[in-house]
Amino acid sequence: MKVLHVYPESDQLIQRHVTMLTDGLRQSCQVYTACNPVSARQQLKQLDPDIVHVHGCNQFFLLRTMRSAGKMGIRTVLTLHGQLEPWVEQHQRTQDKASRWLLLKDTVSHAYAVITLGRLERTNFEKMHWNRRTEEIHNAVITNATNAQEMATLTFAIYQKVIDSNTLEQMDEVSTATLAAILKAGIMGDRRWVSELPNTSPDWRRLLIYAEQENIRNYVDYGINILGLQTPMLDTSRIEAYFPDNYLKPKPLKEVIGEYQGDENEYILRIIRQIERQPLLLHLIELTRELYRDNVDDDKLTEMLEEKNLLGFAGRLMQVLSEQVLLDEGYMPLDPIDDKQTEHLRKLLTNHLKI
């Protein structure tokens, strides 16, 4: 893990904090520092860090660094260092233009995590409602309530939490292809349905964490067993992560739309309608299981979909199912559609865990 710390060289207290923190972090990750705009810009491009940790937010180059990192797909952590406390904030607002204040708010809201250095600072910041992903770590430079090693340990735990969030965004093509094959095996219960697997090993940690957060770990574990793959021991239920503000762990379809009532076509129609409302990978998997059943009447189902104005969406859904869970074309009740609206559906699925 590579972490770039960016701080203002003019603030001696922050500089002491960064020095103490980075000294404690060196055993856990690769740490780099930048204390001016030129160095921050150069290292951001050269290092391609996993995380950019910005200290303070009252200088424009700090905000610009955070925004540049975000555009590059690099996750950011912000330690406030008291710079948004009410007494500081009021003075700042009288000096700053409204546009700069809005820029500050927008930048802080997009940080993966905001670290406050005490209970009062955390309470005051939370009242602003700028970012719900707020943490509290005391500053060992100015208090005996903690020490340098504990401060570093708690900070690294936040870094790990950031890295373990929305792992789909960080997965490579091998990992996503392996996941699709695993899901196909998990759905069918027979490795003969999977034609081939990638030759190289996937990023198992990210893959398994993603499965946990999408509540598909049971399908993934079964598929791994069917394919005879070797994976690391990882209790993903205990791994912490950050989620979007509106995130709820996906529930099985029976808890959302009710149980199967004996009419397969009607049940599939209900599933497709639910997926149109909220596309979730878990529900795509459950739909695929139903499409492989013998009692699906393709012609009747197509008529029912047309009556409910779901024919176009269902066609796009078939295309996405062929990619996400390798649904065979012979089991699609209608032809797949691949257009701009299909791409929108892909993005909704991809961005489910996006901060």
Name each model-derived stretch:
Residues 137, 141-142, 147-169:
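C-terminal alpha-helical cap of glycosyltransferases
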Residues 43-62, 75-77:
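Short N-terminal targeting/anchoring amphipathic segment
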Residues 161-355:
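Conserved NTP-donor binding/palm subdomain of two-metal-ion nucleotidyltransferases/polymerases, i.e.
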Residues 1-37, 149-153:
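N-terminal subdomain of nucleotide-sugar transferases
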Residues 109-133:
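A short, active-site helix/loop in glycosyltransferases that binds the activated sugar's phosphate group
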Residues 97-113:
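Membrane-proximal helix-turn-helix segments that form the acceptor-binding/catalytic region
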